[in-house]
Design a protein with these regions (language model features):
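Beta-propeller domain segments
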Residues: 1-81, 89, 99, 111-112, ...
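Boundary/junction segments of secreted and surface-exposed precursor proteins
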Residues: 123-127
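Short, exposed beta-strand-loop hairpins at the edges of beta-sheets
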Residues: 102-107
Length: 127
């Protein structure tokens, strides 16, 4: 895909990795973040628990400390939202369980695995 020959990124020093953002024969990214969100994992959600998210790309991030949910259509991002930022933790991984539950792996100290399920009417009324 071109990195590091082409890039929208910058080094830790602030200098551009390369002045080129495109070149012949290199497929450009569908999306990118500048400054970097430090994406750490990508999942295409296929589960049934979060039906509205089926086919969405879930991108865990270290810098933004969230999961980006991206909706793609015809190879372009048509919608994006930030999820789980209230955790206040760097999210290293996002995984889907066999029943469609989502598992987040944080690398904060101490690291943890967080299971995410839809809130049910019954659990909303529990103390």
């Amino acid at each position: 895909y071109g990195w590091p020959a082409t890039s929208f990124g910058i080094n830790y020093s602030g200098a551009r990795i390369t002045p080129l953002t495109s070149a012949e024969g290199i497929t450009p990214p569908v999306t990118y973040w500048t400054p970097s969100i430090a994406p750490s994992h990508l999942l295409i959600y296929q589960g049934a628990l979060f039906e509205a998210w089926q086919g969405s790309f879930l991108v865990s991030t270290l810098v933004d400390q969230d999961v980006k949910r991206l909706t793609l259509n015809d190879n372009s991002v048509t919608d994006s939202e930030s999820l789980f930022s209230e955790l206040g933790a760097r999210i290293r991984g996002v995984h889907e369980g066999p029943d469609g539950a989502i598992y987040l792996l944080t690398d904060s100290d101490p690291g943890s695995v967080i299971e995410v399920r839809p809130k049910t009417v019954d659990s909303a009324n529990e103390p």
